[in-house]
Amino acid sequence: MSRVGKAPIALPKGAEVNVAAGVLSVKGPLGTLSQPIHSLVKVNVENDTLTFSPADESREANALQGTMRALVANMVKGVTTGFERKLNLVGVGYRAQLQGAALKLQLGFSHDVIHEMPEGVKAETPTQTEIIIKGADKQKVGQVAAEVRAYRPPEPYKGKGVRYSDERVILKETKKK
């Protein structure tokens, strides 16, 4: 049995779980998320806890049990507290600002980069060189952060570019004669 999958998920106040037609949906103060449940995994909802068990004793069922438990745990956390990723812009003239729901980035190109935010994901710019991406869906928040970083990833000689706030860029030494 999966060690991750064996652990029950405690539902915090304000979170509701519904299982219908092979789809598990979690509703909370920050929205609603749903996830199809694989046929090799059984879900039990008792009081304020969720437990997952494999439908049979195959390796695939054990692996999917842990996967489904982790995905649903992220959904529960997302609809109650939410997820966020912080990005920093490092470089002369690099700045970010919000234009409605879109993010306008000046990253040293001859043009401004406009990044549209998908549904359920919001961006904030506390300063011109900081971006905070928030949302209930962990996968979407991480994907948007990766897309913004991909416009200008940190380069290895000066460290200029868009980086995660907790990212450490290892700088290379320049070529010597």
From Swiss-Prot:
Gene3D superfamilies hit by this protein: Ribosomal protein L6, alpha-beta domain
Keywords noted in UniProt: Ribonucleoprotein, Ribosomal protein, RNA-binding, rRNA-binding
Domain of life: Bacteria
An annotated Gene Ontology molecular function: rRNA binding
InterPro entries: Ribosomal_uL6-like, Ribosomal_uL6-like_a/b-dom_sf, Ribosomal_uL6_a/b-dom, Ribosomal_uL6_bac-type, Ribosomal_uL6_CS
GO biological process: cytoplasmic translation
GO cellular component: cytosolic large ribosomal subunit
Pfam name, any one: Ribosomal_L6
Subunit-structure text: Part of the 50S ribosomal subunit.
Functional summary from the UniProt entry: This protein binds to the 23S rRNA, and is important in its secondary structure. It is located near the subunit interface in the base of the L7/L12 stalk, and near the tRNA binding site of the peptidyltransferase center.
NCBIfam families with a match to the protein in the record: L6_bact
Entry's family note: Belongs to the universal ribosomal protein uL6 family.
HAMAP family to which the protein is assigned, alphabetical: Ribosomal_uL6_B
Protein name (Swiss-Prot/TrEMBL): Large ribosomal subunit protein uL6
Species the sequence originates in: Cupriavidus necator (strain ATCC 17699 / DSM 428 / KCTC 22496 / NCIMB 10442 / H16 / Stanier 337) (Ralstonia eutropha)
Gene: rplF
